[in-house]
Amino acid sequence: MIMDNSGHYLQYNISDNLVLFIKPIKVFLCALATIWLLVSNEVYSEEYFNINALESLSGLPEDIDLSIFIQDDQQPPGRYWVDIYLNREKIDTGNVDFVIVNNKLSPKIRLKQFKEMGVDIDLFPSLSALPPETEITDIGQYISAASSSFDFNKQRLDISIPQAVLLNKARDYVPSHLWQQGLTSLQVNYSYSGSINWLDGQPGSTRNNFLNLRSGANWDAWRLRNYSTYSSQNNKWQSLSTYLQRDIHSLKSQLIFGDSYTPSPIFDGFQFRGMQLVSDDNMLPDSLRGFAPTIRGIAQSHAQVTIKQNGYIIYETYVSPGPFIINDLYPTTSSGNLEVIVKEADGKEHRSVQPFSAVPVMLRENSLRHSLTFGKYHSPTHRGKEPYFMQGTVTYGVSNNITVYGGTILSKKYHSIALGTGYSLSDWGSFSFDVTHARSELNPNIYSSGQSYRFQYAKDLTQTGTNFTLAGYRYSTHDFYDFKEANEFNITSNNSYTPNKRSKLQLYINQSLGDLGGIYLSAFQQNYWSQKGHERNISAGYSTSHNSINYTLNYTYSKLPSTNHNDQILSLNIQIPLERWLKNSWASYSLTNSRKRETSHQISLNGTALEDNNLTYSLQQNYTNHNGSTGGNISTEYKGAYGQLNAGYNYDKQSRQLNYGLNGGIVAHPYGITFSQSLGDTLVLVRANGAKGVKVQNYTGIATDWKGYAIVPYASSYRKNRISLDTYSMGDNVDIDISTQTIVPTQGALTLANFQTRIGYRVLLMLSHKGKEIPFGATATLVQKNESDEPNSTIVSNDGQAYLSGIPKSGQIWVKWGHKDAQECRVDYQLPEKTPESGLYMLNAACE
C-alpha cells in the first residue's frame, strides 16, 4: 500500500493477487514483531511494533508506507467483495469500499443504502437532512448503539442496527428498487420434432414434422410474446396467441394486453383477447405468499420469540417490550397447531398454542388479491359466440380465521355475481362456501337463470400424517350456465343442445406411513343436466422403498357419461439402482393389467452419461399377452450449451418408427446473438467477455460460447438468483476477480450477470532496481493501453516477487514504493513463446 504526493492512500480493487501474498507478509511481520517484543524493555497490551525495525533488519527505504500493517487485524483500505449481514442475518453480497477510520477498516455506505436496509431515517433529523448519496463511515455517530465490524479473514461485514429503528419488513424481502427489468432483446424458443413411420404390409413410409415457436421481444418493462406452430400434416402455420405484458410494482400486479386466460379461483377460467390487470404473488416474499396465521403477543422485556410446529422450530426472532406482531411465517401445511414460546430476558418462558387451518382460497390477514379483465371471449371450438365482457374479482383476508371473496362477469347477454367466504375451524379444519348467480340469453328469446354452489373442506391430521381435502364443487341448478357454457350453447338439428354441468365432486386423501411409505386416493365425479350417466375418475396408489429399491402400486378407473364402459388399469413398478455396476443408471420393471385382461410386461434400462450427466439414454423391451406381441424402444437426448438433441427408435409387431427432435433458444441482445437450451420465461445472460467454455454451476450442459456468453434459460422472478461460474473450467489464460453474481430479475426479463474477466497470462516477476530487490509493500501495476482496460495491480512480496494474472504477451509494468519520484520505476517485459507446463511464467526483470 502506498501514498501519493499529497499523503493520501491510493486505493485499488483487492483481488486474488493480494490474497496470494498478504499471508506471507503478515507472517513475516508477526515474526519480526515477536522478536521486537521479546527484546523490548516495555510491554504493550496490543500487538504493535516499530515499523522502523523492518528498515534496520531488511534494508527497506525509510519512505515506504507500511503503517497499515502495524496491527494484526489491519488491512489496506480499498474495495472488497464481502458478505453483508444486518443484525446477524445475511442480506446481500457485493463490493464495498473501505477506508481507515480510528486505525481500522470502516465501510463507506450511502445513506440510501441504510434506508434500503429498512432503517427508519426519519427518526433521526441529522440523517434525514443529508442527501441520499452521502457516504457514511460511522453510523454510530448518528444512531446510538449502531455499529459495523469487518472480519477480513471471512470477508464478512456485520452491521448492527437497533431493532426499534428498523421498519417492519418480511423475511427474504427484496426491495422493488433492486428488481431488474433487464436488457433490450429479441428471443425465439423453438421445438422441432419429426418422425418416419413404416407399417408392415404397406409400401413406403410416412413423415411428420412439427415446429413449435415461442418468440418475443423485451424493452424496458414491456414483454411482447407470440406462440405459433407449424404442422406438415395440414401444411399450415397457426398463431395461437400474442400478448404484451408488463409489471406494475406499486400494485404488485401484471398488466396484459392481447390473448390470455382469466384467473380461476372464483370463476372458471377461459381464453379471451383484451386487457387484464391481475395480482402477481411472485412479487411477494416467500414468507408472505400462501396462507399462514398472524401471531400476536406481549413481551414483558427484550424477549426471544420461538414458534414451533410438530416439534420443529419454524421461526425465531427477538422483540422489544410490549405488544408484538409476527406476520411473515412461511406457509407449511394447510392446518395444524403452532406453539408460541416467549422467553423473557430473565429466562422465564410463556407458552401458548395457536391452531390454524386453511383452504386454498384463504389469504393472510389484511392481504388483498384482485383481477380486472376487459375483452372479447375466445371460443375454443370456433363455433360459439364471442361477446365482449368485463370480469372483476377480489379476495381479502379479514383475519386469521376469515377470508371473503367475490366477483362479477358482465356481458350484453350474460351477467353473473359470486360471493363467498373461507373460514377456519381451528382443530376441525377449514372450509369455504360460495354462491354464484348467473342470468344468460342462450339464444334469441331463450333465457336462463340459475345458481351454483361450491363447498370445499380441508384438514391435516398431524397425529396420523393424513392430508384430507373434500370439495363439493359445484352443485348447479338446471338453468345455471357459466360464461363458457353460455357462449358455447348450441342447439343441433334434432333440438338437442350441449349439456351444462350439474355437479362435481372431488376427494383427495394422502396418508404417510412413515418408513413404510405412503398411500393416496384421488376421486373425481361430474355429471350433467339432460344427460344420463356421469364422468368418473378414480386413482389410488401406494409407494415405498427398501434398500434403495423403489416400489409403486397404482390403480386407475375412468368412465365417460356417453358410454356404459369403463377402463380399469392396475400397475406395479419396481426401480432398482445399478450404481454399483454402471454409474448413474437404474433398471425398471413394470407390470400392467387392464380390465380387458390384457397384461403387459416392460423392462427398461435408464441412465445418464458424460462428465456433466448431460446425455440421457433409455432402452425398453415389452411383451403383451394380447396376440403375443412384443415391442421395444431406444432413445437418447443430449443437452448441450446451444440446445438439446434427441432421437429414438420404436418398433412393435406391426410398425416401426424413427423419431428425432431439436430444442433450443436464440437470443439477440446488445452484445450479439447467443444460442441456448430451451428458454423459460425469465432468462439470465452470462457475460464473461473472452472466456470460452466456462461452465455455469448448477445448470447441466450450460457453458459460455466462443465469445464468453451464455444463456441461463430459467430464473426465479423477483427473487435473488446466484449465478456462479465454475472456476475449474476456466482456461489457463483466464482470470476472474468474482465468480458469483446475484441478480433479481422481473418476470420475463433478460438480466445481465456481468463477470469482469482478465484474459491473458499468469506471471511471477522477480523485480530488482539498480541491482537491489524491490522492497516488499511496493505496488506493481500493469500500464493500461486503453482507458476501458480494468485496473490490474498487485503488492510486491518479500524477495521482490510480484504475481500478476491476465496480462498480455508483452507490456509495461509500473512499480512504486513511496511518494518520491525516485521511488518508482518501470519495466518492459516480453513473455517467451513457449508456454510452461504449469501455465505460470517466471521472469527476472530489471526495473529502470
Regions found by a protein language model. Name each.
Residues N95-D97, G701-Y709, E787-Q801:
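Short, acidic Ser/Thr/Gly-rich low-complexity loop/linker segments typical of extracellular
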Residues P76-F98, G690-T700, G771-N786:
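Short, ordered, surface-exposed loop/turn motifs in non-cytosolic proteins
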Residues T184, S205-L211, K236-L240, F291, ...:
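Residues that define the transmembrane beta-barrel architecture of outer-membrane proteins
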Residues F98, G182-Q202, W219-S232, L255-D259, ...:
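Transmembrane beta-strand segments that form the barrel wall of outer-membrane beta-barrel proteins
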Residues Y190, L213-A217, S241-R246, G392-Y396, ...:
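Residues on the lipid-exposed face of transmembrane beta-strands in outer-membrane beta-barrel proteins
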Residues D4, Y44-R289, R595-V667:
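Post-signal-peptide, soluble extracytosolic/periplasmic N-terminal scaffold domains
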Residues I84, G297, V684-A688, Y761-K770:
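A short, amphipathic beta-strand motif
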Residues D259-Q271, S432-S503, L553-N573, L591-S600, ...:
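Outer-membrane beta-barrel translocator/channel fold
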